[in-house]
Design a protein with these regions (language model features):
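Short Pro/Gly-enriched beta-strand edge/turn motifs at strand-loop
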Residues: 8-16
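Short, compositionally biased leader-like segments
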Residues: 1-9
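Active-site- and interface-proximal helix/loop "cap" or "latch" segments in soluble metabolic
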Residues: 16-28, 33-107
Length: 107
């Protein structure tokens, strides 16, 4: 298999539809092992439209280049209540990715 699956989590703000279903926001990403490129992404926002929007924002970025550019794009283009939770989830996802890369280097 040429990809890995990683998830990042963050608390949702109160007053959101997704908060009625989930306590946390989760972003999942399928990532190319060699280049770190996000091949596919999903999140637990309440509407399919918002889920597709987030995937379209994230798809194609390489985590080898860091997480700052995807975070900047989310902040610029996602103007919903979950913006800060999306950023926190992305940071957590990137932390998981870094741990995977470090484990790979040490093994």
């Amino acid at each position: 298999m040429n990809t890995i699956f990683i998830a990042g989590h963050a608390r949702l703000p109160s007053g959101m539809a997704a908060k009625n279903i989930y306590e946390t926001l989760t972003i999942t990403a399928e990532i190319d092992k060699k280049y770190g490129v996000i091949v596919a992404a999903s999140c637990t926002l309440a509407t399919q439209h918002s889920q597709v929007f987030v995937e379209n924002i994230l798809r194609g970025y390489s985590l080898q280049d860091g997480i700052e550019t995807p975070i900047k794009v989310v902040k610029e283009y996602y103007l919903g209540k979950a913006g800060n939770a999306l950023v926190s989830s992305l940071k957590d996802l990137y932390k998981q990715y870094e741990q995977h890369v470090l484990l790979k280097v040490h093994n």
